[in-house]
């Protein structure tokens, strides 16, 4: 199918749903040259037709992050059903457990317990991080609380040729005991409990610094907070930190970032294999809750086809390994 969504005008797609249901045409509007597209007119609370799912996957491969407006989603069950169109679901988290949730697959991204204002890719400390993440708005502050999402493929492509070749030879150790769980300030017992649970079981996995996307073939910088200040194999700790800082600055260049402003009944779907994201802490810690459901992923590979490997921790209860 030809993708016309990168033109300056809004495009439309019409599909027929399963069981006689009809999904009306939906519009696609790019949000930037390198990342992001807004989708309207698609009811995600209903079962989607296979060709609709294929079109969404196609758009995701191109735009890396899709912002669905007026989705019709009101429950975790509906969000789970949408996410399952793309593969088996993971558990909510490898170490953090939540009570009172309707499903073991739902991770509440709640301002009462955590603030994810560090650039990261979800759960890269396990052998097969999620391939996709979905975030659904549940409770929103009066202002602020936007989410930034960065295109790690565009960042890789922007590197000088010599630096690209160097990065392709590197491997990084990702751990759940990282700066991600060391916020600048702890404001409640709930935050302290969340941090303690996050590191309650140790995970360390070695991933390529440049990962090849299994569907698009694109190369992207696979780093972020869980690799930050951790040793890159073959260099000193100080050199590791300097190299990671250089590469990370490319990932978060404004040209490669989309800023998502949250609205009611909104869902964001992003490709966790080739993006990073950051939750802006600019809302005075008003109540803010997004529910996250993730889709099980594959084991990352580098440009030579070499696979990531686990050093510590068993994540089999968190996620099955899927093949692309």
Regions found by a protein language model. Name each.
Residues 2-267, 273-324:
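Non-heme Fe(II) oxygenase catalytic core, chiefly the N-lobe of the double-stranded beta-helix
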